[in-house]
């Protein structure tokens, strides 16, 4: 009910690479040229859809978006570029802290040395989009 006018036109499983996502996007846009949003489970899927949409000439950039559930410096950069339609990767769900490897190391060290540690680790889940990308994007 959040998007009563939305129609799911295709579900594609198993997209794990940028190339596979570009191929799936090509097929999607050939069979459904009016697609306005693509949701992806992982970053590579979104990056591939974004690359296809940006280069195909078949997409009205101001009317299209892709969203995912993954995080990397490249994803942050693409979301930042979407502020000026230089990317169509409009947002992502960021899982975990800013330093997951360090946090994991600290927890494991405490476990191995018999020190007390939090038994339940709740990683933060944050939606990152144009409204808060400046907090997460670090220009090189």
Can you describe what each PLM-predicted range is?
Residues 1-140:
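A residue-level marker of the well-folded mature domains of exported/periplasmic proteins
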């Amino acid at each position: 009910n959040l998007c009563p006018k939305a129609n799911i036109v295709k579900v594609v499983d198993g997209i794990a690479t940028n190339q596979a996502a570009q191929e799936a996007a090509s097929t999607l846009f050939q069979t459904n040229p009016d697609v306005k949003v693509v949701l992806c489970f992982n970053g590579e899927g979104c990056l591939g859809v974004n690359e296809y949409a940006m280069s195909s000439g078949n997409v009205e950039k101001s009317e299209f978006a892709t969203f995912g559930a993954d995080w990397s410096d490249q994803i942050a950069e693409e979301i930042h570029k979407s502020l000026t339609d230089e990317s169509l990767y409009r947002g992502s769900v960021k899982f975990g802290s800013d330093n997951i490897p360090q946090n994991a190391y600290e927890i494991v060290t405490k476990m191995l040395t018999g020190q007390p540690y939090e038994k339940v680790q709740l990683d933060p889940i944050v939606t990152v989009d144009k409204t808060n990308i400046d907090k997460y994007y670090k220009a090189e």
